[in-house]
Structures are given as structure tokens and as C-alpha cells.
């Protein structure tokens, strides 16, 4: 069941076989109710623009994620134009098969879908097309994937990222042009003062921040609650959470070094890890596009916690690469043989950070990338291997679906940013479709 709100609008004309069309509508509605949390729909096929307007007036104010326009029979472009007067969400156009071949063309649904797609293209409105009957598995899978992508498109358009401090010196890839970001992806930014957070968080009374320690103890192995760095982790996390709530933030991009070590006296990795584990994806080094990449992966993968790492090693014999970071990783990503183990930052030797290898499984690797020419997407696939922890900190060895050496050279020559987001599960098809919907160049390695 997808947690999404779909506006289902079955359209037809009475000059076609409306009785057969109604059977299609009933089966479609039954399937939608079984797979989407909320479905808003008329009680029968809408057969005139006047009838459609009456229905649309009756549902004004409803918040939806997707418009599902089913051309149950042929209908002209007036219907879609009327819907666009009321709703600006992306549209899925659905055509069904003819019930029989030979004699009268009973529905002409495919031409109706063709006509509607033409209207949407000429209105420069984002849309997708699906074809098939509601009981066909291939149609169901495609439609679910499409509905999920549409939901993420809407979530992106509402995404508000808290940027906690500027990016470290020389980390130019972490920045974003706010106007271009809003125009291309719909994302907005909220700037926060890191030094102010350091100053104020240590003033918080224990009863306010102790809950963060107790939360960490539920999953982190070897956590010493008496360690001063654990206290500072909890204080800082609590302070930031207040701003997350007051500003209604959906994700974070946080400056980490050198400030955390020099000014707070604690590693940032624990805060990044716990926030991401609990659904507030947080990138390090104030990587705004890294945070967006993590957010998209979590949304498409059903809430699975994503990872963000550098590509640090390649093993040509195993056709594998290693993604690593110095101590950030959501707890649930840990290899079950070790669990999410507490440690110190591998270079600064300050706690508390995470220190574990990631679990095995199918993974999708992704990056929302930016160049002087604009935005592009990178989509890769592989399998995380069940191996010993490659490097201190958090790391994962991934056997790629494509030739690792060739892929490495292509990534470098294309100048991708050195942070790659990763999530467990295969959402490559979703990402490719997302790129099409956003009209972005999408490079695929699957």
C-alpha cells in the first residue's frame, strides 16, 4: 500500500460502449483502493465537460499527489484542459485495451490517451502514459512505479532543506544556487548558523537532551553515555531538532569539519547518523545536492535509510568499488555480524562516530549532479558484498553491474561530485523515470 493521494478521473463518451467501459472503471477503482492509501474519484465515468466541472468543484481544497486520467473511451482534449484549471500536479494518462477485435471499435481508449498526451505536451505539463487493463501485472507494476515517482516529484517541490553552516573550504560541489535549485527541482533552502548552535546547545538542561542518548542506546553498540562527546552529541541534536520542528524542515545539509572538532569538541557523525536513521536525511560537508539525493532515495525505497559516501577504492578482480565516509551511517545499515558500533573519528580521534561495515544486499547508487550546463542525474546499480569492513569509519564494498574500471574512468571524466548516495533495493527504473519527468540528462550504469 502506497501512502499517497490519487485523484482518479475516468473519462468516456456515451457514443462508445459505456457499459464495457464501466466494467473497466470498477476494476480500476478496486485495484487503486487496494494499493493507494487515498483515492478521490467520481462515482461513475465522467461523460461531459460540464459533469467534470461539477465534480472538480466538489473536491476543491483536497490535497493530492497525482492526477490519474483514465481515457476509458476516446474523449477530446477539453477534459484534460479543464482538469489543468484546477490541479497542477503531474498527470498519469491511462489507456485500456479494446475488449474485442473485429467489428465495431468499442472504446478507442488508446486514441483518447494519445490525444490527452498531446494536450499535456503542448501545455508543457509533466505527465506519463501507461497502457493496459487493471488486472494485468505489468500494468500494475508500471502504474505503482509511476505513482511513486509522481509522489516524489510533489515531495521535491515541497522539500525544504536546513543548511547548517557553509561548506568547508574548497568543497565547492556542496553549494547550490538557490534560484536555479528552486526552478529546476522545486527545493528551497533555510540557512542556519552553526556557531550559534554550538553556543546555545550546551546550555540545554539534561532533561531536554537525555532522550537522544537513550534513543542511540537502542541501536548503538558500545556507547558510553558518560562520555563528554556523547553528551555534546545529544545537546547539539536536541537543539537542531527544535529548529527542524519550528521551520518544518524535511532534510539537512550540515557543515562538519573543522568546526565540530575545534569548536564543539565532538564528532558530527553521530548526529548525522541518528537523524538519517530516524528519517531526517542529513548530508555532511553541507552537501546540498547530496542531501537531495539521499531524500529522493529514501522516498523511492519505502523509507529505507540511505548512505552518503566517497568512492575511495576499486578492485578490478572483483569488479567492485568501495564507498566510505569517516563515521556517518544510519544504524540500520550496519552489517548484522557487528551491528552499529560506536567509535571515534578515524583522523581526529574524537567521538562519537560510527565504525562499521555496511550490510550485504542489492543497492542503487545515485547523485543529483550539477554542472555549469545545469542539472543531471547519475543512476548506478550493484550488490553490496558481505565482506570485512574495508576501512575504519563506515564503508561498503559494492560489486557494480557494469565494468568497474570503465565506470570509474567515465565518472571521473564526466566530473561527477565526490559524494554518492546509496540505498538498499533497486529503484533504478524509478530514478530514470524521475529524470524524464524533470527533463534532466540521466546517465545510467545498470
From Swiss-Prot:
Record keyword Isomerase present: yes
Protein name per the record: Sulfoquinovose isomerase
A GO MF label: L-fucose isomerase activity
Keywords: Carbohydrate metabolism, Isomerase
Catalytic activity: 6-sulfo-beta-D-quinovose = 6-deoxy-6-sulfo-D-fructose
Isomerase as UniProt keyword: yes
Function: Part of the sulfo-TAL (or sulfo-SFT) pathway, a D-sulfoquinovose degradation pathway that produces sulfolactate (SL). Catalyzes the isomerization of sulfoquinovose (SQ) to 6-deoxy-6-sulfo-D-fructose (SF).
Protein's organism: Priestia aryabhattai (Bacillus aryabhattai)
Induction: Induced by growth on sulfoquinovose.
Taxonomic path: Bacteria, Bacillati, Bacillota, Bacilli, Bacillales
EC numbers: 5.3.1.31
Family per similarity comment: Belongs to the SqvD family.
Gene Ontology biological process: fucose metabolic process
Positions of disulphide bridges: none
Pfam hit, one: Fucose_iso_C
Amino acid at each position: 500500500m502506497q501512502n499517497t493521494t490519487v485523484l482518479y478521473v475516468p473519462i468516456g463518451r456515451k457514443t462508445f460502449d459505456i457499459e464495457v467501459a464501466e466494467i473497466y472503471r470498477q476494476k480500476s477503482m478496486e485495484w487503486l483502493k487496494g494499493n493507494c492509501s487515498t483515492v478521490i474519484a467520481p462515482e461513475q465515468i465522467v461523460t461531459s465537460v460540464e459533469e467534470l466541472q461539477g465534480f472538480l468543484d466538489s473536491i476543491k481544497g483536497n490535497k493530492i499527489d497525482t492526477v490519474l486520467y483514465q481515457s476509458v473511451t476516446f474523449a477530446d482534449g477539453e477534459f484534460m484542459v479543464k482538469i489543468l484549471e484546477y490541479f497542477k500536479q503531474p498527470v498519469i494518462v491511462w489507456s485500456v485495451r479494446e475488449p474485442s477485435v473485429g467489428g465495431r471499435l468499442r472504446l478507442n481508449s488508446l486514441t483518447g490517451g494519445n490525444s490527452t498526451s498531446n494536450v499535456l505536451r503542448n501545455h508543457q505539463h509533466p505527465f506519463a502514459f501507461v497502457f493496459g487493463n487493471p488486472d494485468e501485472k505489468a500494468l500494475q507494476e508500471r502504474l505503482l512505479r509511476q505513482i511513486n515517482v509522481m509522489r516524489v516529484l510533489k515531495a521535491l517541490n515541497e522539500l525544504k532543506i536546513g543548511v547548517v553552516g557553509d561548506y568547508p573550504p574548497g568543497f565547492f560541489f556542496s553549494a547550490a544556487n538557490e534560484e536555479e535549485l528552486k526552478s529546476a527541482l522545486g527545493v528551497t533552502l533555510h540557512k542556519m548558523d552553526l556557531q550559534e548552535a554550538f553556543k546555545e546547545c550546551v546550555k540545554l538542561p539534561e532533561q531536554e537532551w537525555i532522550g537522544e542518548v537513550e534513543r542511540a542506546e537502542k541501536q548503538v553498540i558500545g556507547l558510553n553515555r558518560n562520555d563528554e562527546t556523547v553528551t555534546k552529541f545529544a545537546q547539539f541534536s536536541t537543539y537542531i531538532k527544535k529548529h527542524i520542528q519550528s521551520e518544518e524542515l524535511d532534510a539537512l545539509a550540515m557543515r562538519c569539519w573543522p568546526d565540530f572538532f575545534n569548536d564543539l569538541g565532538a564528532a558530527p557523525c553521530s548526529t548525522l547518523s541518528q537523524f538519517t536513521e530516524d528519517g531526517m536525511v542529513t548530508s555532511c560537508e553541507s552537501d546540498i545536492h547530496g542531501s537531495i539525493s539521499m531524500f529522493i532515495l529514501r522516498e523511492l525505497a519505502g523509507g529505507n535509510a540511505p548512505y552518503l559516501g566517497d568512492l575511495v577504492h576499486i578492485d578490478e578482480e572483483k569488479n567492485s568499488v568501495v564507498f566510505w565516509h569517516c563515521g556517518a551511517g544510519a544504524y540500520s545499515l550496519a552489517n548484522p555480524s557487528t551491528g552499529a558500533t560506536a567509535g571515534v573519528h578515524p583522523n581526529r580521534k574524537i567521538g562519537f562516530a560510527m565504525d562499521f561495515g555496511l550490510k550485504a544486499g542489492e543497492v542503487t547508487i545515485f547523485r543529483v549532479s550539477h554542472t555549469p550546463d545545469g542539472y543531471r542525474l547519475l543512476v548506478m546499480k550493484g550488490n553490496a558484498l558481505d565482506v570485512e569492513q574495508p576501512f575504519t569509519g563506515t564503508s561498503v564494498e559494492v560489486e557494480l553491474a557494469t565494468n568497474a574500471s570503465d565506470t570509474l574512468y567515465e565518472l571521473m571524466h564526466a566530473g561527477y561530485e565526490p559524494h554518492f548516495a546509496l540505498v538498499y533495493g533497486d529503484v533504478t527504473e524509478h530514478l530514470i523515470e524521475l529524470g524524464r519527468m524533470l527533463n534532466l540528462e540521466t546517465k545510467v550504469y545498470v
